[in-house]
A protein has these predicted regions:
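N-terminal amphipathic/basic-hydrophobic helices that include classical n-h-c signal peptides
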Residues: 1-26
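A composition-driven signal for long, intrinsically disordered, charge-rich low-complexity tracts
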Residues: 5-6, 14, 206-208, 212-216, ...
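Charged, low-complexity surface segments at secondary-structure and domain boundaries
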Residues: 14, 112, 249-252
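Phosphate/adenylate-binding glycine loop and adjacent helical scaffold
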Residues: 18-230, 274-281
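Accessory, usually C-terminal, subdomains that scaffold auxiliary metal cofactors
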Residues: 216-281
């Protein structure tokens, strides 16, 4: 006679330990290709939406007003502040695709103002205010936050330190601010997975920039010329992208139903459109 016990979990309730039926991913019913495509589309929309906030002159101006003489130091200390009192070299390793000497110097400048935790709090509130100001007209912000929080809850934190740090930051209560903050956390999840895949590929950070967005971005991330173009590693870079998208697809397949996967991709694309329409150029 088989002996059965119960296993309790705060999110999924109680299950018999002898239950032989595995719990299938929620995303069943959608082909693997569709799942990966939706995950890739949502990832691109989230990345671009958060980049609008990170790169906007208004954000830099607010960092300057908060005491960061160099607003890039405010960005580095703000985004990396959840790592705690780390060395510049450690933060540069986590940021992965920045020129490390310059990144380390920006970190030291930034944490000298308010410390690491204080910088993270300032940056988090800046993200919230940016969402309130420019995302309020977007449709489905509550759903972006709800679905995003479910994905954040199931995603492992191992080897993705910025995601691990940001996922425990308190979220704003209002939908526009909360939605942008949730997208911010999801951006760190995908970026961390991408960096892990990149590190295994043999593609250097500067080669990755050249294979992705080219010399303008390479310079923006602090790399000096001449730039190694990595032209012989195009196929490898494509596989890095595919690996990242497949892993994100696995996670969304656990967190969401099939219809919700497509829904999130559509809502984040619409949110990005709203930002592009409302944010001053």
């Amino acid at each position: 006679m088989q002996s059965c016990g119960e296993l309790g979990h705060p999110r999924i309730g109680r299950r018999l330990l002898c239950d032989p039926t595995p719990m299938p991913p929620k995303g069943l019913g959608m082909t693997d290709t569709d799942l990966v495509e939706h995950a890739a589309a949502a990832g691109a929309a989230v990345e671009q939406a958060v980049a609008v906030f990170m790169l906007h002159p208004q954000t830099y101006a607010e960092s300057s007003a908060a005491g960061y003489e160099n607003p890039l130091a405010g960005y580095v200390a703000g985004r990396g502040g959840v790592l705690g009192d780390a060395t510049g070299a450690t933060v540069a390793a986590v940021f992965a695709v920045f020129e490390p000497t310059g990144l380390s110097a920006l970190w030291e400048q930034g944490v000298a103002v308010r410390g690491a935790a204080g910088a993270a709090e300032v940056y988090w509130e800046q993200a919230a205010e940016f969402g309130r100001r420019y995302l309020a007209a977007a449709h489905g912000l509550d759903r972006i936050a709800e679905l995003g929080e479910r994905l954040i809850a199931v995603a492992p934190t191992s080897s993705v330190p910025l995601f691990a740090g940001w996922k425990v930051m308190p979220l704003a209560g209002d939908a526009p601010a909360r939605a942008l903050q949730v997208m911010f956390v999801l951006r760190e999840l995908r970026a961390g997975l991408h960096f892990n895949a990149l590190s295994l590929s043999g593609i250097s950070p500067i080669e990755a920039h050249m294979l992705n967005k080219g010399p303008r971005y390479a310079a923006m991330f602090g790399w000096p010329e001449p730039f190694a173009d990595g032209a012989d590693k195009k196929d490898r870079y494509a596989e890095v992208e595919n690996t990242t998208n497949r892993r994100m697809a696995e996670l969304v397949g656990i967190a969401w139903e099939s219809a919700e996967i497509a829904e999130f991709a559509g809502l984040t694309a619409a949110a990005l459109t709203t930002l592009k329409q409302t944010v001053p150029r």
